[in-house]
Amino acid sequence: MQRLDLDSLCAILGDQVVALPLERGLPPATGLASHTDHLRPGEAFVALAGAHGHGLDHAARAEAAGAAFLISDRPHPRALLVRDAAAALAHLGRHAREQRRGPVVGVTGSVGKTTTKTLLGAATAARTSPGNINTPAALACVLVHAWLVDAPERPLVIELGIDRRGEMATLLELVRPSHGVLTAIAEAHLEGLGDLRDVAREKSLVLHAAPAGRYVGEQAWASLDPALHASSLRIGLGDGLPSGRFDAAQRQLHARLRRPDGGEAHVSLTLPGLGAPLAQAALVALQVALDLGVTPRLAAERVAAARLEPRRLQAHVLGPLTLLDDAYNASPVSMRAALDVLAALPAPRAAVLGDMRELGSRSHDAHAELGALVAAADLAGVWFVGPESRRAFEATTGRHERHHHPDVEALLRDKAGLPRRGSLLIKGSRSIGLDRLVDALLAEHALTVAS
């Protein structure tokens, strides 16, 4: 493992350095962190200016967490003083990227990018960006960590998430992917990105930036600029090559992959979770892994054993109840997919559905469409949560038991009315806080078992 000492940093940053720390004898750093919550002992803390303060305000917390030293554009006895901390961090990220000789895969899309990143990382034994960390500062820290810890040939898979125009170009300038994956184009983050054409334009930049391989999921293909079709590989369940057949009941994926010589490779596996979205992500991971030199059998074994990110269609068996936790995010396309997964689970089925945020002017109609979708579903009951979901509640008619709560606190007070057998989906935008409901139900079950 390499370390970053002050001399090395000065050599890399050049005239961006203003002064060395006043405190002498500081140890070399094992990496960088721009947020104290992500700081590991031995890393240097990069104190950035923010909308509500400066990172140096948290210097004591960083030191208590074990920071080797600080990098800041404001004076501190243990800080390497630079002209602009954000610019210095970006420079270090670009330097780290230049040291890599292995593939760097950028993964983006309106839905499915985190799961695809996770499975692709497993299939290729790659380092992956943690969680859904997508800011330039955080990704610069990921690049530096990979440079210091990994062999330069090890694959690196980075999630590229954006919610406004111009962000993708900034991320791509830093990450410079050799391979690009576009999972889906759908209505998400419309407030900052614009309409669906704007989403497609921004997301597809990852393909333009990737010289060695371009992979496009079935849900993105129709929205893609036709000029990119010839240079991109379309991947989806159904016909074509590559493609796959998915048995939802058995969680079995039977994949047909395209070999580099144009031939076919076949492999079957049991997926580590539920639903067609997971099967689609696995298919992409298997194809990219094959192109990166991993045998289909080994890639399939790794995908089958992958540990998925929490709160993405995560199933919990609570006695007679299967709780489907999809409380991390929500958009029209992911709501439909989650309801499809719920439909394959044991009856009686019910759902708790929160607001789909950041849809801009589409919010009213999108929630009305969700209500119509729920009305047609085979559900014993549905609980809507949040002000925007009121429209979905009003559009839900028929035989369902239906409820609306203005916020998660109100539902938590009434959670005794939720079903305790069959299957229950809980899904909504993260800001609604439905993860609190999931945790409350899990804790309730744990107490029941303990007693």
Please report, for each region that a protein language model flagged, where it lies by residue.
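Acidic, Mg2+-coordinating active-site environments of NTP-dependent enzymes
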Residues: 9, 13, 72-76, 181-322, ...
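N-terminal leader/targeting and accessory segments in enzymes
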Residues: 1-91, 95, 343-347, 351, ...
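Active-site beta-alpha connecting loops in nucleotide-dependent enzymes
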Residues: 51-53, 60, 309, 328-401, ...
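Residue-level signal for inorganic ion chemistry
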Residues: 9, 43, 62, 92, ...
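ATP-dependent carboxylate/acyl-activation modules
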Residues: 107, 310-313, 431, 435-437
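Short acidic-hydrophobic, aromatic-tinged amphipathic segments that line or gate anion-handling sites
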Residues: 80-84, 401-411
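Phosphate-binding loop of NTP-binding sites
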Residues: 88-218, 223-228, 440-450
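Short amphipathic alpha-helix with an adjacent loop that forms part of the alpha/beta core around
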Residues: 173, 410-419
